[in-house]
């Protein structure tokens, strides 16, 4: 509940902002008051860009990354190595890997991890699409770049079991602590993690 000093419309903005990751009560209040009082033009610009994006952004038919086109820039890039497939949890992981400049293959974005307690199973992660991609392409290595959490370990194990035995499966390792999230690793640690990946 927001404070009674706020009107219903201001409270609605505050509550909406609180739904964002890492935004707590105080931060949502500060953001709402800044946007409404100090920079209403910014609020309108943000609202318009979000409306436009939600109407036009979809998931790439291959890797499940967010894109405006049916196929994203990475999947449509013929200079990428089509024989390597890196499986990641989110687009934030893709950004981290791309910015580190350590990988030139293709991706598959799970958009989550298997977590039965949260109602997330293989179908929610589109693993049927992943299986089809692996079957259709001449992939010689699948790289599991999944965070070493309990859910991440479950997800990595499930995926490794569904991949054909003649395909090399590796897992990034060095420098990624248990419970750590890939997106928060610095580029040097990520480089070591990729170079020190182990076969499953």
UniProtKB/Swiss-Prot annotation:
UniProt entry tagged with the keyword Transport: no
Ranges where the Toprim domain occurs: 83-177
Alphabetical keyword list: DNA damage, DNA recombination, DNA repair, Metal-binding, Zinc, Zinc-finger
One annotated GO biological process: DNA repair
TM helices/strands, residue ranges: none
NCBIfam families for this protein: recR
Primary role: May play a role in DNA repair. It seems to be involved in an RecBC-independent recombinational process of DNA repair. It may act with RecF and RecO.
Protein name as it appears in the record: Recombination protein RecR
Taxonomic placement: Bacteria, Pseudomonadati, Pseudomonadota, Gammaproteobacteria, Thiotrichales
């Amino acid at each position: 509940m927001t404070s009674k000093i706020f009107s219903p419309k201001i409270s609605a903005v505050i509550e909406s902002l609180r739904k964002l990751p890492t935004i707590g009560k105080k931060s949502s209040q500060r953001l709402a008051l800044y946007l409404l009082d100090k920079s209403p033009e910014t609020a309108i610009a943000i609202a318009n860009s979000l409306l436009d994006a939600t109407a036009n952004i979809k998931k790439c038919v291959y890797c499940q990354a967010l894109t405006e086109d049916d196929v994203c820039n990475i999947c449509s890039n013929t200079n990428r190595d089509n024989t390597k497939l890196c499986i990641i949890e989110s687009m934030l992981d893709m950004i981290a890997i791309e910015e580190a400049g350590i990988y030139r293959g293709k991706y598959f974005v799970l958009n989550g991890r298997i977590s039965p307690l949260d109602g997330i199973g293989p179908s929610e992660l589109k693993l049927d699409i992943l299986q089809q991609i692996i079957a259709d392409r001449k992939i010689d290595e699948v790289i599991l770049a999944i965070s070493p959490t309990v859910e991440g370990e479950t997800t990595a194990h499930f995926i490794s079991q569904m991949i054909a035995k003649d395909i090399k499966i590796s897992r990034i390792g060095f420098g990624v602590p248990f419970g750590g999230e890939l997106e928060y690793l610095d580029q040097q640690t990520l480089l070591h993690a990729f170079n020190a990946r182990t076969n499953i």
